[in-house]
């Protein structure tokens, strides 16, 4: 009997893993004692993330669940054939019903079926504020509460003040005040409305008068000094009355911000602007026009450069000139003046550091180098005569160690026989040393020449071998 592979209880491909976590504070069931305080949270599929990371290494960046690695496997890898379960179909179904039935089967096979109660999962709807934040005390001013209650909670309410003590019949008085206080007041209001018939402006800061409302106005905010140097009302003054501590705090705040008034703050630092502007921009043309207009205003005319004259003398001179012009009038043809070119520009009025006008010169052409056809040496480069002064100076700077030491020394006239023998012997030894060095140099040059010839022979043989191959 053949061995059959036992079907596993859990299909790892379609299986879903969960984490057991605490229920969220925003969950409405967090305050329910019957509901479990721990819920199941589906885990993120790590294998999918690993597969996507491996796909990125191969250059596949598609963000879907398809396995592209199956097309990148080796062709020599063995494949395993898994038989699919047989699905029974009812032949009596209609074609349309048959297609719907096939879609339902495919969806049922592909999707994992989870049959767990909803209480083990988190609620779909969550509240905006958590359970612990709801129970937390509220800090800050309460605009929706009565100022007396806020003052009492902050321990700023003066219980010893006789005005703050309630009388025995305060409920009856309060009901009389809220009831309207009689029909005479109503008649007065109706009469004023009928007589005026126009819109009236009411001051919101002044409040209601004692004649109109009686004892309704006990604690009005208009009695308190709530204005600051920034706003008409402060945040705390809109909720509670100002006591000594709050007034002192406001005074310190105003005193501190006096340092930032317009009179106290100095001029701001100039901003360093960087950028590029086109030479033909309209903004640059406007600036240049303004500059010329300002220069025309500042410059003086030739008439203004001389000594000041009395106005009477100036008027007489002008009258004489007008009379002469009226008497002698000749017609002359005035030609327009020729346009004059000048090297001075608007930049030269500031500085001549970069503006240096001069004639444009044609640079001399470089002399053509001629080469000798025999030697290949450029002509007119080497000296034609003897040594120049620089060459003589260079020869004189030669190191003395390169010249003969004994032979170059002058012979003394007063030398004796022993000194002459010693001098001749030194010259002989020096010449012998020079002959030895000369012989060694010749031998070294000869060996180097032979070695280079051998290298050339080997190189030619290698080149010929490469050509033949």
Swiss-Prot record:
Disulfide bonds: none
Record's keyword terms, sorted: Coiled coil, Ribosome biogenesis
Example of a GO biological process term: definitive hemopoiesis
Cellular component terms (Gene Ontology): cytosol; nucleus; preribosome, small subunit precursor
Biased composition annotated in UniProt, kind: Acidic residues: 183-213, 315-328
Changes seen on gene knockout: Knockout disrupts ribosome biogenesis and embryos display aberrant cartilage structure, defects in digestive organs, characterized by smaller size of liver, intestine and exocrine pancreas, and impaired definitive hematopoiesis.
Family indicated by similarity: Belongs to the LTV1 family.
PANTHER family: LOW-TEMPERATURE VIABILITY PROTEIN LTV1-RELATED (PTHR21531), PROTEIN LTV1 HOMOLOG (PTHR21531:SF0)
Protein name: Protein LTV1 homolog
Organism, as annotated: Danio rerio
Organism ancestry: Eukaryota, Metazoa, Chordata, Craniata, Vertebrata
